[in-house]
């Protein structure tokens, strides 16, 4: 199997960052710059996405989780802090289910425990249908705009454009299938790790009920809400986001 792209910067206790749908390693650039000053930051690009666009994509959240755990095994990383954004939040929940004792602290960012994502701006199946009807170019410009309050006028929107340059329709559809078929709600009670949940109150991908479900069911969790932010809080309120995460993991 072709190796995926993994950026690995800084020294210290590892922080693993897992991007979401149509994301990339580069989309964590502001976090890499900040956190690499005091910890080792590992940011894979998921198979088929971003810098790993030439790798064969997966249609299973569990397989994505296993792939990242495999990367960490190769790097001989035993314990780590773990953050996942959106679909990446599903992946980190699955990683914690498989290897929870290795996760020091968990950060579930703009995510939920139900892959179908109740309350999303459209159903996963609708996105799949539009993807097939409209193709990648239209879909890849339509969906990421919804992740920012300012849409494609946000200063960091270019990261979304970069991320999708070489992503195929099959990869995009496989990830939608993976999300649609995944659920982690029954496992939330088994997550004992200290957990930070982050959400922007204008997020149209995940509504409050989704993050509240995480908060109510994960025993050692706390929820932090960013006002007037959408789905990409880490790109909309970079400094506040980074400080919040730093205070949590240190």
Q: Where does each model-flagged region fall?
A:
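Short beta-strand/loop motif that positions the catalytic acidic residue
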Residues: 191, 197-199
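Acidic catalytic loop of the alpha/beta-hydrolase fold
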Residues: 202-206
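Gly/Ala-rich beta-loop-alpha elbow adjacent to hydrolase catalytic centers
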Residues: 84-88, 92
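Active-site loop/oxyanion-hole signature of alpha/beta-hydrolase fold enzymes
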Residues: 32-33, 42-83, 98, 243
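Flexible "cap/lid" loop of the alpha/beta hydrolase fold
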Residues: 93-98, 103-133
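Catalytic histidine-centered segment of alpha/beta-hydrolase-like enzymes
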Residues: 229-238, 242
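Conserved alpha/beta-hydrolase catalytic His-Asp/Glu region
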Residues: 116-122, 133-189
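Conserved HGGG/HGGXW glycine-rich cap/lid loop of the alpha/beta-hydrolase fold
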Residues: 5-54
């Amino acid at each position: 199997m072709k190796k995926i792209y993994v950026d690995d910067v800084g020294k210290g206790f590892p922080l693993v960052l897992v991007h979401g749908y149509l994301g990339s390693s580069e989309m964590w650039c502001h976090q890499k710059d900040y956190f690499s000053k005091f910890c080792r930051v590992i940011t894979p690009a998921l198979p088929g996405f971003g810098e790993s666009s030439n790798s064969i994509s997966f249609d299973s959240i569990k397989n994505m989780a296993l792939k990242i755990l495999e990367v960490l095994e190769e790097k001989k990383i035993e314990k780590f802090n773990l953050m996942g954004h959106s679909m990446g939040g599903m992946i980190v929940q699955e990683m914690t289910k498989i290897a929870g004792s290795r996760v020091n602290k968990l950060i579930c960012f703009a995510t939920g425990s139900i892959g179908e994502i109740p309350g999303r701006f459209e159903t996963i199946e609708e996105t799949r249908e539009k993807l097939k009807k409209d193709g990648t170019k239209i879909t890849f410009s339509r969906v990421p705009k919804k992740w920012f309050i300012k849409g494609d006028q946000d200063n960091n929107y270019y990261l979304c454009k970069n991320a999708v340059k070489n992503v195929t329709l099959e990869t995009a559809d496989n990830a939608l299938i993976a999300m649609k078929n995944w659920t982690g709600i029954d496992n939330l009670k088994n997550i004992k790790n200290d957990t930070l949940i982050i959400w922007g109150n204008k997020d149209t991908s995940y509504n409050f009920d989704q993050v509240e479900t995480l908060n109510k069911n994960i025993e050692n969790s706390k929820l932090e809400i960013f006002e007037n932010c959408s789905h990409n809080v880490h790109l909309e309120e970079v400094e506040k986001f980074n400080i919040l995460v730093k205070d949590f993991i240190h």
